[in-house]
Regions:
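Charged DNA-binding/catalytic regions of mobile-element recombinases
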Residues: 1-285
Length: 285
């Protein structure tokens, strides 16, 4: 209260006289008096607002490197240290991933393709190597199964489908979406696990019709299809595990928005120079 009185009459009487009259020290008053905001503090406030917005748009997936790339692309002059400091000071944390269970049904007598990929996930152009797999999401209506096809060149999801049953038709619909979208040339490697959906006669017949080279993982080796496993871990951490799903349709709409509205066009990958799959393909064209 005394400090506020000094501030009110400062200028009309000397600060020293007011302090002596009210029995307070000059140092105490200076420590209490609000200091003007510096330009750097103002800049921090602007940067923090952008960080909060990108944290929301990225569903909490961007740590310091990706966040810095995003802000720099927007024209902000920021570095990794400043972004990291502001995120730490304001409790802005990254969503962590968890291990996923396998859904492979390999207890069958169907033919299995050789492992052409052999854990070489690199490609020099789109439509050289594709990989597919199936995962599952729990809803209050029961399981929802998700099949995806990913282009290993850009990590882009080029085909996907959902169903309440993990049958071959689910995998076939994801493949047909990918083929219709990309029109891959003959000889594209198509890699999956040994699941019965992918080993089925109908699925293998489609692969031959479209000119794919079929490739399958070794028995029980999840690392042979690590790229798709990584996508599922990311999807579940950034979307699936963050809320309960009451009906399958609700989850399906959210998957559509995540894949087509965020993951493909916006989500940055360190392996792609912190570019999104769509941007990486566009700049490489």
């Amino acid at each position: 209260m005394r400090f506020a009185y000094i501030e009110q009459y400062d200028g009309k009487l000397s600060q020293g006289e007011l302090c002596r009259f009210l029995e307070v020290t000059d140092r105490g008053y200076r420590a209490w008096r609000p200091r003007p905001i510096s330009q750097r503090q103002r800049d921090d406030m602007v940067i923090l607002a952008h960080i909060r917005e990108q944290h929301r748009l990225s569903v909490g997936s961007y740590g310091r490197p990706r966040m810095t790339e995003e802000l720099q692309e927007q024209g902000l002059a920021v570095g990794h240290r400043r972004v990291g400091r502001l995120m730490q000071q304001n409790g802005i944390k990254v969503v962590r991933t968890h291990k996923c269970k396998a859904t492979t049904d390999s207890a069958h007598n169907l033919n299995v393709a050789p492992n052409l990929l052999d854990q070489d996930f690199t490609a020099t152009a789109p439509n050289q190597k594709w990989a597919g797999d199936i995962s599952y999401i729990w809803t209050h209506q029961g399981w929802l199964y998700l099949a995806v096809i990913i282009d290993l060149y850009s990590r882009r999801v080029v085909g996907w489908a959902v169903s309440n049953k993990m049958k071959k038709d689910l995998a076939i619909r994801a493949l047909e979406m990918a083929v219709n979208l990309r029109q891959p040339p003959e000889g594209c490697i198509h890699h999956t696990d040994r699941g019965s959906q992918y080993c089925s006669h109908d699925y293998q017949k489609l692969l031959k019709r479209y000119g794919f080279k079929a490739s399958m993982s070794g028995k029980g080796n999840c690392y042979d299809n690590a790229m798709v496993e990584t996508f599922f871990k990311t999807l579940k951490a950034e979307l699936v595990w963050r809320q309960p799903w009451h009906i399958r349709r609700q989850c399906e709409l959210a998957l559509f928005q995540y894949i087509n509205g965020f993951y493909n066009p916006r989500r940055r990958h360190s392996a792609l120079g912190y570019k999104s799959p769509v941007t990486f393909e566009r700049k490489a064209a």
